[in-house]
């Protein structure tokens, strides 16, 4: 596990964008795993800037998003489908049929999960997987207690995640969906060739310390990343402040 400490959020975004840019320049038909939430927004802004500068061509790139709320249509303003189009896809030259986001509004959620898992497998896995981390150590919607053998599946959101995400729903936790489709931990670990985890802010400091330096435990789902052979953590100073060491290999 390699840990990079960024001086500030803007540097975090530039460092992570550089990894993606290098991957696409090396392999035009790269497969990217993407995340939502506030942390990757700056990364996507940087990628848009690089695209507009002619430094990245997304025309052959394929993407898979980590997760999606159950019960929200793709056009719902708080759906992750809407988020991704607003913050990235509508600003770059992605082919629409190369964009994959779990179908949260599919009445057959279990079947949709299997289809999604199969699509990732058929794509040959994910070259670079972007992850955020929850204050409770979750990755995707794999909450504490999630089995490390889980594949893409329907998950129940924890109360802490519902409260954390309420800010996207006008501050009202009642409006936050209780279920979501998420890549499972096994999916992420097995299919991702390079995992890039982003963390910003002091509210992530405990999770980052436990993820990197604590025991591997389902109580901290992100701790399983210690077992992956190619992980880059990019954290700003506030998120990294509780690490005992910033040098890992």
UniProtKB/Swiss-Prot annotation:
Matches recorded under PANTHER family: GLUCOSAMINE-6-PHOSPHATE ISOMERASE (PTHR11280:SF5)
Enzyme Commission number(s) from the entry: 3.5.99.6
Catalysed reaction equations from the record: alpha-D-glucosamine 6-phosphate + H2O = beta-D-fructose 6-phosphate + NH4(+)
GO cellular component: cytoplasm
Signal peptide range in chain numbering: none
Involved pathway(s): Amino-sugar metabolism; N-acetylneuraminate degradation; D-fructose 6-phosphate from N-acetylneuraminate: step 5/5
Family membership noted in the UniProt record: Belongs to the glucosamine/galactosamine-6-phosphate isomerase family. NagB subfamily.
General remark: The gamA and nagB genes encode isozymes of GlcN6P deaminase.
The name this protein goes by in its record: Glucosamine-6-phosphate deaminase 2
Gene induction: Part of the gamAP operon. Strongly expressed during growth on glucosamine. Expression is repressed by the HTH-type transcriptional regulator GamR.
Pfam family of the protein (one): Glucosamine_iso
Keywords, in A-Z order: Carbohydrate metabolism, Hydrolase
Effects seen without this gene: Deletion of the gene prevents nearly all growth on glucosamine and severely reduces growth on N-acetylglucosamine. The gamA-nagB double mutant cannot grow on glucosamine or N-acetylglucosamine.
CDD domains: GlcN6P_deaminase
Gene Ontology biological process terms from the UniProt entry: carbohydrate metabolic process; glucosamine catabolic process; N-acetylglucosamine catabolic process; N-acetylneuraminate catabolic process
């Amino acid at each position: 596990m390699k840990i990079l400490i960024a001086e500030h959020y803007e540097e975090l975004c530039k460092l992570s964008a550089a990894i993606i840019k290098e991957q696409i320049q090396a392999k035009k038909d790269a497969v990217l795993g993407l995340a939502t939430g506030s942390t990757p927004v700056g990364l996507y802004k940087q990628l848009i800037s690089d695209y507009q500068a002619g430094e990245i061509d997304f025309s052959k790139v394929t993407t898979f998003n980590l997760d999606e709320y159950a019960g929200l249509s793709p056009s719902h303003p708080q759906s992750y489908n809407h988020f991704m189009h607003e913050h990235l896809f509508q600003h770059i030259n992605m082919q629409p049929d190369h964009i994959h986001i779990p179908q949260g509004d599919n009445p057959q959620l279990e079947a949709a999960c299997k289809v999604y898992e199969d699509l990732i497998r058929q794509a040959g896995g994910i070259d670079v997987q972007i992850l955020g981390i929850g204050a409770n150590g979750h990755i995707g919607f794999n909450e504490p207690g999630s089995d490390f053998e889980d594949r893409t599946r329907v998950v129940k959101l924890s109360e802490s995640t519902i409260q954390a995400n309420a800010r996207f729903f006008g501050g009202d936790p009642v409006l936050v969906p209780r279920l979501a489709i998420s890549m499972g931990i096994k999916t992420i670990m097995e299919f991702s060739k390079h995992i890039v985890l982003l963390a910003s802010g002091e509210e992530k400091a405990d999770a980052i310390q436990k993820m990197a330096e604590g025991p591997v435990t389902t109580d901290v789902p992100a701790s399983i990343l210690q077992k992956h052979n190619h992980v880059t953590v990019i954290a700003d100073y506030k998120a990294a402040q509780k690490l005992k060491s910033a040098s890992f290999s």
